[in-house]
Amino acid sequence: VAPGAEYARKRLFVHTISWMPKNKLDSRVAGDKFCYYDYLGTELQLCEAAGGDNIDINQIYQYIKDIREKYDIYYTTITADPYNVAGIEEKLADICDNFILQNQSPKALSQYIEALSQEFKDGNVAYCGGQEDIFEKAVTGSVMVRNTTGYYSIEKISLRANDNIRIDPLDATLDGFIANYIDNARDVVNGDDALSAWEDMFGGD
């Protein structure tokens, strides 16, 4: 983003990383009919917990911490699925201003699903083309469903138990979007304010 540049509309930048137990890679490639091998080290990271049979949440935390330090990123709000971060909640809370364990029920997520859907429709969701294939597969393989109580949920297009669609990256994107949504509602510091503060600190014009 160029200092002082004006943009006609906001954009939500999405970057996703998928995690998979190392020993399940071959079976996932065969079962999903998707060549995950092509994305190792970029869109996909392998976990070696329990000898490569389980997801290593501490490895995920370390990745989040490392990119924060490498790129000097300031985490304002982190939103997470409680089930997926059990054991590292306090660590995540320590590296951001606001840490939210997001209830994953349709009632709790419905308003955010509607809001994220509108951002997609308005063309406000941006990501690096050719570098988010796993994310794209999740988006094109999912559908927004309204249940009998009127609440929305994100579901696979196919509800068969043996289908090869994984929508986890989109579920994670929704949690990330909630953080952005809440930050905007709170009117926290924006990018222009942060840039101005940085310029003042270092004597810029």
Give residue spans per PLM region.
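RNase H-like, metal-dependent nuclease domains and their acidic two-metal-ion catalytic environment used
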Residues: 1-104, 110, 114, 137-205
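A polyampholytic, Gly/Pro-enriched intrinsically disordered region
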Residues: 118-139
